[in-house]
């Protein structure tokens, strides 16, 4: 018996909508990352992008446990001396609520070209409205 290897052209990708309202950030991010990689499919192949498209709505209503809302800090660096910037979860969720879920999921995907291709299939929206109704996404309950 030979090992099955998925062909990139033969992969069937579905569209799913995930409602993040009231969900814990890490728990929803792990399930989204797993779906983007395609690990829920029988034809999963590590070196082929077999994942589905995921639309996340209500990103502004995602929650974190404990006192991570004030204590969780996101860092970035401008590559210039003294260019370290930081922002707390509370401020980031007020300014760019989509970025919280995007950063959590991006950290769970592989680095490199394959991971970037998987990340491009993630669509995050702060509110209820999204512009992907033409793809007829299915509701994914996490």
UniProtKB/Swiss-Prot annotation:
Assembly mode: Part of the 50S ribosomal subunit.
GO biological process: negative regulation of translation; translation
Primary role: This protein is one of the early assembly proteins of the 50S ribosomal subunit, although it is not seen to bind rRNA by itself. It is important during the early stages of 50S assembly.
Alphabetical list of SUPFAM superfamilies matching this protein: Ribosomal protein L13 (SSF52161)
Family matches, as NCBIfam families: rplM_bact
One cellular-component annotation, GO: cytosolic large ribosomal subunit
Pfam families: Ribosomal_L13
Record key words, sorted: Ribonucleoprotein, Ribosomal protein
Name of the protein described by the UniProt record: Large ribosomal subunit protein uL13
Gene3D superfamilies: Ribosomal protein L13
UniProt record similarity statement: Belongs to the universal ribosomal protein uL13 family.
CDD domains: Ribosomal_L13
GO molecular function terms noted in the UniProt entry: mRNA binding; structural constituent of ribosome
């Amino acid at each position: 018996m030979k090992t099955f290897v998925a062909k990139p052209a033969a992969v069937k990708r579905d569209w799913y909508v995930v409602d993040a309202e009231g969900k814990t950030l890490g728990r929803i991010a792990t399930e989204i990352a797993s779906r983007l990689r395609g690990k829920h499919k029988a034809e999963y192949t590590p070196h082929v992008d077999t994942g589905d498209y995921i639309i996340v709505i209500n990103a502004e209503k995602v929650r974190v446990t404990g006192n991570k809302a004030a204590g969780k800090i996101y860092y970035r660096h401008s590559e210039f001396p003294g260019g370290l910037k930081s922002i707390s979860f509370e401020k980031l969720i007020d300014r760019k609520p989509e970025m919280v879920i995007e950063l959590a999921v991006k950290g769970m995907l592989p680095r490199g070209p394959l991971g970037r291709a998987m990340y491009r299939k993630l669509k995050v929206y702060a509110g209820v409205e999204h512009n992907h109704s033409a793809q007829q996404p299915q509701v994914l309950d996490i």
